[in-house]
């Protein structure tokens, strides 16, 4: 450094340094921080802890291990909390409308606290579904050195000597409703499915997005697949405390990590693992935060060239803890690297490339969770994008857990998830029908609820292989069966799904990438001319605010975006 060079400073110096900051230091001393603490880099610890449900229950304890690591590496941690909604608990209720909305609130609130306190670095601790993309989006906006650590998966439960997850409980509801399961068995399953803390145990949304975190490079490779309630997870948390200090010293920022290449790597991981369709929504939003050009067709292109390698629930035999035992997420990365399906030079938070990290993977001899490239489950991945007169902006179908590539039948229309669930229970839905659930999109719901209650109830009946379901809402990562979600434009903005009637013939043709209702253009236009937007379900509060600002699902259902107004909520009017 020359004599004329400015003195190096930390972002947090604007809060803690100089005589005029004495009032701020006085308040920080009252909170227990010493003058020595305030001279060190200040690292925000964004926690999504709640005691409502198992997914985030252990994060308060895990945060202590992170803070220990930060202190050991010469930093001062400052922990704060944000919100979290348990998808598994709210599923099938009005409360589920809060889930996707919470992604934006999580990102907004972390951004506010970090900007307000001028942290030098940030670790975001996530668990349940929306906390993962929400924390990543906050890191992108802030663009300060930081990383996301996932709290880890729950251990599998046991029922009649079989491994079970929460998916089995949801499906048991349909089995029980049809008289094929006793009250006693349902209660026993309920008591044993979730043995402790950790996120839902299959390749559902949380584990899909935690894998994406590692493939994006914003989580250390191998950290997220470590199960929740293990000493190893505590050790990982402590190492992350060390790592964030190294990121601060080297000034490695999310904008250097989350690039187009990194996002394409993450999409490949979803395809190879049979991951949740929610990844489409979240990765579009993550791309948006970094101004990376990405559209839903990119998911189809990448999935089409990526083999399905992981036999994970909901369609396979294995749970997330089995994946860890087999070699974890690094093993999946190693397979895709060997197939030349990754951008090998993408940077990660360790300072190494994803190729350098993947080469360190250790495969457990005899494991069956991650297939060799010579013996994939399928030659192509689990996601496809369909378009047609029923979804001009596109929709998403997951090709895992069923073999049907073509379905045609009369529509059975429901105006909400509750109506559709009642249709399963009272046997209104008949074999051969296409179940249409509308006004559940980002604006119409609002909040784009997941339809797991409906799909799981169907899966627990004899209808499982004989109906298809389409919706402008979403599906849980635990969904299996022929289900098409994210239909856009959505019904609330006059998308074609709004004017489908009972008995209309709908064709779902996966190979042709088509979703079509058998109406001429003139017939469809005539119906749309007579369509009137329904009254908003909420006229004040967070849901009303969200509905007025959210974009179409085809753009990631983002809010406060720079996307042109014509794309907001998929409006065609």
Swiss-Prot record:
Q: Where is the active site?
A: 476
Q: Which residues bind [2Fe-2S] cluster?
A: 55, 128, 200
Q: What is its EC number?
A: 4.2.1.9
| Cofactor mode of binding and number, as noted | Binds 1 [2Fe-2S] cluster per subunit. This cluster acts as a Lewis acid cofactor.
- SUPFAM superfamilies xref list: IlvD/EDD N-terminal domain-like, LeuD/IlvD-like
Required cofactor names: [2Fe-2S] cluster; Mg(2+)
Q: Which InterPro entries would you find in this protein's record? A: DHAD_IlvD/Edd, Dihydro-acid_dehy_C, DihydroxyA_deHydtase, DiOHA_6PGluconate_deHydtase_CS, ILV_EDD_C, ILV_EDD_N, IlvD/EDD_N
Q: Report the superkingdom from the record.
A: Bacteria
Reaction equation(s) it catalyzes: (2R)-2,3-dihydroxy-3-methylbutanoate = 3-methyl-2-oxobutanoate + H2O; (2R,3R)-2,3-dihydroxy-3-methylpentanoate = (S)-3-methyl-2-oxopentanoate + H2O
Comp. bias (Basic and acidic residues): 1-14
Is the keyword RNA-binding assigned to this protein? no
The UniProt record gives the binding positions of Mg(2+) as: 87, 129-130, 450
Query: What is a GO molecular function of this protein?
Result: dihydroxy-acid dehydratase activity
Q: Which Pfam families match?
A: ILV_EDD_C, ILVD_EDD_N
Where is the region Disordered?
1-21
> What processes in GO biological process is this protein linked to?
isoleucine biosynthetic process; L-valine biosynthetic process
Q: Which UniProt keywords apply?
A: 2Fe-2S, Amino-acid biosynthesis, Branched-chain amino acid biosynthesis, Iron, Iron-sulfur, Lyase, Magnesium, Metal-binding
Q: List the pathway annotation.
A: Amino-acid biosynthesis; L-isoleucine biosynthesis; L-isoleucine from 2-oxobutanoate: step 3/4; Amino-acid biosynthesis; L-valine biosynthesis; L-valine from pyruvate: step 3/4
N6-carboxylysine: residues bearing it: 130
- Quaternary assembly: Homodimer.
Q: Which family does it belong to?
A: Belongs to the IlvD/Edd family.
Job of this protein: Functions in the biosynthesis of branched-chain amino acids. Catalyzes the dehydration of (2R,3R)-2,3-dihydroxy-3-methylpentanoate (2,3-dihydroxy-3-methylvalerate) into 2-oxo-3-methylpentanoate (2-oxo-3-methylvalerate) and of (2R)-2,3-dihydroxy-3-methylbutanoate (2,3-dihydroxyisovalerate) into 2-oxo-3-methylbutanoate (2-oxoisovalerate), the penultimate precursor to L-isoleucine and L-valine, respectively.
Q: What is this protein called?
A: Dihydroxy-acid dehydratase
Q: Which organism is it from?
A: Koribacter versatilis (strain Ellin345)
Q: Which gene encodes it?
A: ilvD
